[in-house]
Amino acid sequence: MTKKVYVKTFGCQMNEYDSDKMVDVLNAAEGLEKTDSPEDADIILFNTCSVREKAQEKVFSDLGRVRELKEAKPDLLIGVGGCVASQEGASIVARAPYVDLVFGPQTLHRLPQMIDARRESGRAQVDITFPEIEKFDHLPPARVEGPSAFVSIMEGCSKYCSYCVVPYTRGDEVSRPLDDVLTEIAGLADQGVREVTLLGQNVNAYRGALTAGAHEIADFATLIEYVADIPGIERIRYTTSHPKEFTQRLLDVYAKVPKLVDHLHLPVQHGSDRILMAMKRGYTVLEYKSLIRKLRAIRPNLSLSTDIIVGFPGETEADFDKTMALVHEMSYDTSFSFIYSPRPGTPAANLADDTPREVKLERLQHLQATIEENVARISQSMLGKVERILVEGPSRKDPNELAGRTENNRVVNFPAPLTAHARLIGQMIDVKINHAYPHSLRGELVLAHDDASAATH
């Protein structure tokens, strides 16, 4: 009987990528298959996030729930990976003694060895070391599950923003060699992937050796240019970028590489220079706005999303008003917005914070309502337009329909004959938008005569 692994992922796209790699590693080593049911699993893994306190506590809540499964099935192995694992280490086992494995983002490739050691010794295994880029040399080839794929190009962060725990849980920035990244993407393209999202905590800080051990370095712009030349790759996305690392070379790539989408996630975090300085972000609001103006001069249809922190220590009403002014001016399509959460060990955790919680919540609600108005307005502006989408698979709302994504990352659901589904999935097609909802669209196929004939037979 095939053994199964269940992985629950918290947090960012980097964690989503790492979770996929955990499954790949265990499949290659022990033949385990992924399951969506923890009750059916032989191994349960939690890939954790420590960016906010709520996400961290959720992990221990979920661990408490699977404890009963272990009591009923003693051979069940439970593991905690990701950033909470890096931060807490062996204290996780002290708090939850039924946990068998604790591993960091850089040691997930060692899971098979850790499992063997746990079975042999009967003791919990903890490995939260930072062996830099070693894990990529030990990962099996990716197993593709659709026409889009994440590709991690670097690990860690060296910015040390005052509020952020990531440099302490993922280490400093380390880039993969250029040829390693290109080899992985070419392999994905051979399996039908048409869109890649390049991942990094500060992805545009990429500085990778041309080959392992080489002295010549490729910057992020060079990497994008090479990826665009890989046969089969139609679209390139990336996340998350940092305004401080947005070079002229990268701006030039937007003019030269049409496969780089008209969508950018560029965290601003706040609209007040005073707060940005306290956050140690390394740029001013004016510098951020100047960068966006340059980008939109090159790409007038650029869709922009961001991250914003509300209620950072010392934030006044005037500071928050500046954030709102920036939101109105930038016309963000999406914002991942949260109330500031102090993280242990970060400089900001020691700052005085006298803003009442209810005031922070009111500000967050005001910000999110404004963003939602922007989202709805942008969706409405797409009505009647023909959009190029990558068909990803059956619609979640109706499996008889198909769904794809626009360049600005909107999901479009559209009807198509069941006989055409297999042919259309993974293809770039045109759809005319005929209904707009805040976070998704509805459209209809726009086909040439020959295509229309093929699609309906």
Curated annotation (Swiss-Prot):
Keywords: 4Fe-4S, Cytoplasm, Iron, Iron-sulfur, Metal-binding, S-adenosyl-L-methionine, Transferase, tRNA processing
GO molecular function, one term: 4 iron, 4 sulfur cluster binding
Reaction catalyzed: N(6)-dimethylallyladenosine(37) in tRNA + (sulfur carrier)-SH + AH2 + 2 S-adenosyl-L-methionine = 2-methylsulfanyl-N(6)-dimethylallyladenosine(37) in tRNA + (sulfur carrier)-H + 5'-deoxyadenosine + L-methionine + A + S-adenosyl-L-homocysteine + 2 H(+)
Top-level division of the source organism's lineage: Bacteria
Location in the cell: Cytoplasm
Residues that coordinate or bind [4Fe-4S] cluster 2: C157, C161, C164
InterPro entries hit by this protein: Elp3/MiaA/NifB-like_rSAM, Methylthiotransferase, Methylthiotransferase_CS, Methylthiotransferase_N, Methylthiotransferase_N_sf, MiaB_methiolase, rSAM, rSAM_horseshoe
GO (cellular component) term, any one: cytosol
Name of a matching Pfam family: TRAM
Limits of the MTTase N-terminal domain: 3-120
Main location: cytoplasm
Function: Catalyzes the methylthiolation of N6-(dimethylallyl)adenosine (i(6)A), leading to the formation of 2-methylthio-N6-(dimethylallyl)adenosine (ms(2)i(6)A) at position 37 in tRNAs that read codons beginning with uridine.
Protein name: tRNA-2-methylthio-N(6)-dimethylallyladenosine synthase
Source organism: Burkholderia thailandensis (strain ATCC 700388 / DSM 13276 / CCUG 48851 / CIP 106301 / E264)
Gene name in the database record: miaB
